[in-house]
């Protein structure tokens, strides 16, 4: 895996202060090691000019961002999600998926609600010349992708996978949630896998989904 460094200009502490930063400097699909925790990358995603689908394994993080940004962002609330699968912190113990069987019920009403809300939100942002920001867990990314495709605007969005190191955790990587999520990302025009956690290069090389992806490191110290 070939790593490329992007030197952060001197005096910059947060991504939002970097005037020349944009996703256009990266290929459509790549790994971004921001290296410095708390550098404001997530905030840039939610305040920058791009239309962004921000994917996170942690519901609480998404809820906190929704509370901070209010109507400027749209938080996908899918009642059919299984908390044990999507709220994945690698420090938490692993649960047996058989212990949390999904509740089988008709999800058409939930889909219709999400379709209406996402359509309404994105249209209003467009009318106001504002970028759209959609917050979603790995589990519900497929729904967002499907709705935006039906609206004819999916290719107007960039997909950012925050804290993607959670996908690499041995046991969890084998779960259906992550495997399905990676399948849908493969069908997406953009996928930016972002983390500040040191990557295990040998491990990434073993995974078909990541071994051929360009790898970028933000250099804050040169």
How should these model regions be labeled?
Residues 2-27:
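Pre-Walker A adenine-sensing motif
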Residues 33:
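Hydrophobic anchor at the beta1->P-loop junction of P-loop NTPases
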Residues 37, 41-100, 139, 202:
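Conserved Walker A/P-loop ATP-binding site and its immediately adjacent core
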Residues 61, 166-169, 199:
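Residues immediately C-terminal
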Residues 78-88, 106-121, 137-143:
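Conserved helicase motor
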Residues 127-146:
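Conserved two-lobed SF2 helicase motor
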Residues 138-140, 150-185, 190-192:
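SF2 helicase catalytic motif II
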Residues 198-222:
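Interdomain hinge/linker at the junction between the two RecA-like core domains of SF2 helicases
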């Amino acid at each position: 895996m070939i790593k490329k460094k992007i030197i952060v200009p001197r005096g910059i502490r947060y991504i939002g202060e970097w005037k020349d930063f944009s996703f256009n400097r990266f290929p459509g699909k790549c790994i971004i090691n921001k290296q410095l925790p708390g550098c404001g990358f997530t905030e840039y995603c939610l305040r920058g000019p791009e239309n962004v689908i921000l994917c996170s394994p942690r519901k609480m993080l998404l809820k906190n961002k929704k509370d901070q940004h209010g109507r400027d962002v749209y938080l996908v609330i899918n009642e059919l999600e299984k908390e044990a699968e999507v709220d994945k912190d690698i420090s938490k113990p692993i649960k047996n998926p058989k212990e949390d069987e999904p509740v089988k019920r008709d999800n058409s009403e939930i889909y219709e609600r999400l379709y209406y809300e996402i359509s309404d939100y994105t249209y209003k942002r467009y009318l106001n010349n504002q970028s759209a920001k959609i917050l979603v867990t790995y589990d519900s990314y497929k729904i967002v992708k499907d709705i935006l495709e039906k609206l004819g605007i999916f290719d107007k969005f960039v997909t950012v996978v925050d804290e993607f190191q959670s996908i690499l955790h041995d046991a969890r990587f084998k779960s259906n949630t992550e495997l399905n999520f990676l399948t849908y990302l493969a069908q997406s025009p953009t996928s930016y896998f972002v983390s500040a956690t040191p990557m295990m290069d040998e491990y990434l090389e073993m995974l078909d989904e990541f071994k051929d992806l360009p790898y970028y490191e933000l250099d804050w110290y040169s």
